[in-house]
A protein has these predicted regions:
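Bacterial Sec-dependent signal peptides at the C-terminal "C-region" and cleavage site
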Residues: 3-20, 30
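Solvent-exposed loop/turn segments at secondary-structure junctions
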Residues: 27-30, 60-62, 79-83, 103, ...
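A short beta-strand-loop structural module common to alpha/beta enzyme folds
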Residues: 51-61
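An acidic, glycine-rich "communication" segment
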Residues: 106-181
């Protein structure tokens, strides 16, 4: 269920289940028009699965110490630029992840805090450019991982395909890449201290949030990150 953060806090005080995932949609750079469609897709996930309570937050300032104590995952959904949480809030988030929290970055999340390398180190890479936009093939390079289990060996999707400042293979385990002669990872996971980090570069257009392969990837990536069944 997606609800405003303040309402979720009231429900929590009333004894309702705590939110498991805080979905941040704040942008300080480019604002993706697909964010509402992506948020709606996560809403359906929360409605259809008893494993997730998903709470949307418009501002990263909502990631207070108290909010993080009650959360199992933080999702940066196409966030961009230097978010309002600032360096103090970022350090708090990084400590929480290293202590065992789950972090999921989707699409433009890799273009967040571009001047703060500690964020890119946690995520696995920093966005550089999107040299190809259109219908492309994604090759699933590891189908044994819980996030990709059940996906086909490859699939075609209309999307914006990223390349990164450094190859994420240096810091992460790559799960999928673009089908091209160059090595262009798109999906990966890594450990940050005791925390789990999952990232997918897919999700630029609205249509990506209706694509069954992308939806399965996001759901299973979140399940893995929070250690859900």
């Amino acid at each position: 269920m997606i609800a405003p953060f303040a309402a979720a806090a009231v429900l929590a005080l009333a004894g309702a289940p705590q939110p498991r995932a805080l979905v941040v949609t704040e942008t300080a750079g480019f604002h993706h028009p697909s964010i509402p469609a992506a948020r709606a897709a996560l809403q359906r996930l929360g409605e259809d699965s008893p494993d997730f309570d998903i709470v949307a937050v418009a501002s990263s300032r909502a990631l207070t110490a108290r909010a993080l104590r009650r959360a199992q995952a933080v999702v940066f959904l196409s966030t961009t630029g230097d978010l309002r949480m600032g360096p103090t809030g970022l350090q708090r988030l990084l400590r929480w992840i290293r202590g065992g929290g789950a972090f999921v970055g989707l699409h433009a999340a890799s273009n967040t805090f571009p001047q703060r390398p500690q964020f890119a180190r946690m995520l696995g890479a920093q966005f550089k450019a999107h040299p190809f936009v259109g219908r492309g093939r994604v090759v699933v390079t590891d189908r044994s991982h819980p996030a990709t289990r059940g996906l086909p060996s490859s699939f075609v999707i209309d999307d914006e395909f990223y390349v990164f400042e450094t190859n994420p293979r240096e810091r992460a385990h790559v799960l999928a890449r673009r089908a091209t002669a160059a090595d262009e990872p798109l999906v990966w996971w890594r450990r940050e201290g005791r925390g789990r980090v999952f990232y997918s570069a897919l999700g630029h257009p609205d249509s990506a949030w209706r694509d069954p392969n992308n939806l399965r990837l996001v759901e299973c990536g979140l399940r893995w990150a929070v250690r859900a069944p």
